[in-house]
Amino acid sequence: MIKMVIVVRSDIKMGKGKIAAQVAHAAVTLVVSIINSNNLRWKEWLNEWLHQGQPKIIVKVNSLDEIISRAKKAETMNLPFSIIEDAGKTQLEPGTITCLGIGPAPENLVDSITGDLKLL
């Protein structure tokens, strides 16, 4: 199975609507970045993901450090990832990192980075 996982920071105060918007930003950013990339493997994964119902799992971490360390792991593994920074127009300071999106990619690869995390 191909899936996308969005990792949300739980150490910053965000309303439900803000969290939903940040998760949506991560998902859209990942898809657009893959479409605009030259990585054929990522494009294959995206196509499979689109035909599998676009599975998305939302999990949480307790710190910015956890977001950064997991992003570095995704980069090392050459997986699509996106770090989302808030624009600062409503609840948060500009540039606050709110979440990390990983995938779409094979479940076993994504799970090696996020499989230990609790669902949001």
Swiss-Prot record:
<dbReference type="InterPro" id="IPR034759">
    <property type="entry name" value="Pept_tRNA_hydro_arch"/>
</dbReference>
<dbReference type="GO" id="GO:0004045">
    <property type="term" value="F:peptidyl-tRNA hydrolase activity"/>
</dbReference>
<dbReference type="InterPro" id="IPR002833">
    <property type="entry name" value="PTH2"/>
</dbReference>
<dbReference type="GO" id="GO:0006412">
    <property type="term" value="P:translation"/>
</dbReference>
<keyword id="KW-0378">Hydrolase</keyword>
<comment type="function">
    <text>The natural substrate for this enzyme may be peptidyl-tRNAs which drop off the ribosome during protein synthesis.</text>
</comment>
<protein>
    <recommendedName>
        <fullName>Peptidyl-tRNA hydrolase</fullName>
        <ecNumber>3.1.1.29</ecNumber>
    </recommendedName>
</protein>
<dbReference type="Pfam" id="PF01981">
    <property type="entry name" value="PTH2"/>
</dbReference>
<keyword id="KW-0963">Cytoplasm</keyword>
<comment type="similarity">
    <text>Belongs to the PTH2 family.</text>
</comment>
<dbReference type="GO" id="GO:0005829">
    <property type="term" value="C:cytosol"/>
</dbReference>
<comment type="subunit">
    <text>Homodimer.</text>
</comment>
<dbReference type="InterPro" id="IPR023476">
    <property type="entry name" value="Pep_tRNA_hydro_II_dom_sf"/>
</dbReference>
